[in-house]
């Protein structure tokens, strides 16, 4: 039986290990938890969601919705567990954070072709290996990777997570349930603010004291997970046109849209925990309590977790990796997950999926499957391996990296729907080959 070592049991590593095992490959899965955790991890589960509990838009008019549907049709472990542990979230797919990670962990442990070895990995093993150790790779392994790749091949940015509050502590007399434009079910708690309340909150936020981030004073921040205080400093109204946007959220008490709205999204199945949408932060914890309780509905909020900030490291992938996430100079080594420069939970899963499927095919003597650029999975693989990219930055899946239609379509929503339909039709043509084990 062929053998592969997978380092890291996050979203990418778990998906990769499972896809390899499903195709008859013996997998040794190395994960440093529970012996050692990164600053962003709390539980001992695999596939722990360290930031939001949302896998973003569910519809096919969204590129991430297309990516999720492609993965579903190709028997993704992560998507199966996400769908099974979904919680109400309007037009998005959100999951019970612990229930999801527990299901992934139990599925991995129960697979006969996967052997789990806990403990920190400090060097790159011999033989075929997939490194999916994540953006918070421990220093010894990061040094081993840097030595293997040569200098100047890793970059970094900062990422942040939002606070969690208990539902019982939210003042529902000052809040209301609704989804934007009444789309889907009213799953979000909306915390309205008057102009005076918002301006006082904004002034306090931009003046609040931040936690120190040692050694990385450039404060390079990924736009998709920007700390709320960084966004606020861009201007008085930036938040009102971003995460605090009131459009489509009519307050039933006034019959009007508020001046600003803070949204809370359910974080677990029973609805006892909610997260502050768009409130990734690295303010000092006492400052978070002081500033965020200025939101009227959160004046007595019980914070179950404060926001945290951490460094994310990723590879200069276009110079290093091929479209199957393999190291060009040494193809026995592949990478997967956020460290390749894909950004987001679903994107990380997709990279692990593709790396696992293609490596299994190689070991089983089969030719690679070139996922077309018209598919979201293929577009991501081509993005991270595109050597013509000048300033490589982490990227969420988006329709901009998928080839356009050969005809004009009126309306962005209709155009995106057609792009998704084209992708899924192409996917059907290669589906059986991908699923062959």
Enumerate the predicted regions with their spans.
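N-terminal FAD cofactor-binding segment of flavoenzymes
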Residues: 18-80, 373-384
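Predominantly flavin-linked oxidoreductase catalytic cores and closely associated redox partners
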Residues: 110-285, 289-290
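Dinucleotide-binding Rossmann-like beta1-alpha1 core, especially the glycine-rich loop
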Residues: 48-59, 83-99
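Helical element adjacent to the flavin cofactor pocket in flavoenzyme catalytic cores
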Residues: 97-116
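Internal hydrophobic alpha-helix adjacent to the cofactor/substrate pocket in enzyme cavities
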Residues: 348-369
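A glycine-rich dinucleotide-binding beta-alpha-beta segment and adjacent secondary-structure elements
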Residues: 276-342, 349-351, 369-386, 392-396, ...
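Beta1/beta-strand and adjacent pyrophosphate-binding region of the FAD-binding site
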Residues: 1-12
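C-terminal auxiliary extensions adjacent to catalytic cores
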Residues: 394-437
């Amino acid at each position: 039986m062929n053998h592969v070592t997978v380092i890291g049991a996050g979203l990418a590593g778990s998906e990769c290990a499972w896809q390899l095992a499903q195709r008859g490959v013996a997998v040794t899965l190395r994960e440093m938890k529970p012996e050692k955790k990164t600053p962003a991890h709390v539980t001992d589960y695999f596939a722990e969601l360290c930031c939001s509990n949302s896998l973003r838009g569910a519809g096919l008019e969204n590129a991430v919705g297309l990516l999720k549907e492609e993965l579903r049709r190709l028997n993704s472990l992560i998507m199966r567990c996400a769908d099974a542990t979904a919680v109400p979230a309007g037009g998005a797919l959100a999951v019970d954070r612990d229930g999801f990670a527990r299901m992934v962990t139990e599925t991995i442990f129960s697979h006969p072709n996967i052997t789990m070895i806990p403990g920190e990995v400090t060097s790159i093993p011999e033989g075929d290996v997939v490194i999916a150790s994540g953006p918070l790779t421990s220093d010894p392994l990061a040094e081993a990777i840097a030595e293997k790749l040569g200098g100047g091949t890793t970059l970094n940015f900062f990422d942040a997570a939002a606070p969690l509050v208990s539902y019982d502590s939210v003042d529902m007399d000052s809040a209301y349930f609704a989804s934007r434009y009444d789309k889907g079910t009213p799953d979000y708690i909306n915390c309205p603010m008057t102009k005076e309340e918002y301006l006082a909150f904004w002034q306090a936020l931009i003046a609040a004291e931040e936690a120190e981030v040692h050694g990385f004073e450039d404060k390079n921040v990924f736009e998709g997970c920007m700390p709320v205080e960084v966004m606020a400093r861009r201007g008085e109204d930036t938040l009102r046109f971003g995460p605090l946007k009131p459009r489509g959220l009519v307050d039933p008490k006034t019959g009007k849209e508020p001046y600003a709205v803070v949204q809370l999204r359910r974080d677990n199945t029973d609805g006892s925990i909610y997260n502050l949408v768009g409130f990734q932060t690295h303010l000092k914890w006492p400052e978070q309590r002081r500033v965020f309780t200025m939101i009227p509905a959160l004046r007595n909020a019980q914070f179950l977790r404060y926001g945290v900030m951490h460094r994310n490291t990723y590879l200069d992938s276009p110079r290093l990796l091929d479209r199957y996430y393999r190291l060009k100079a040494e193809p026995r080594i592949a990478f997967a997950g956020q460290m390749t420069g894909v950004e987001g939970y679903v994107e990380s899963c997709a990279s692990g999926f593709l790396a696992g499927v293609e490596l299994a095919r190689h070991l089983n003597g089969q030719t690679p499957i070139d996922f077309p650029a018209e598919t979201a999975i293929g577009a991501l693989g081509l993005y991270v391996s595109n050597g013509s990219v000048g300033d490589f930055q982490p990227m969420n899946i988006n329709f901009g990296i998928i080839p356009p239609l050969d005809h004009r379509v009126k309306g962005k929503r209709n155009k995106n729907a057609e792009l998704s339909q084209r992708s899924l039709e192409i996917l059907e043509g290669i589906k059986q080959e991908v699923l062959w084990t």
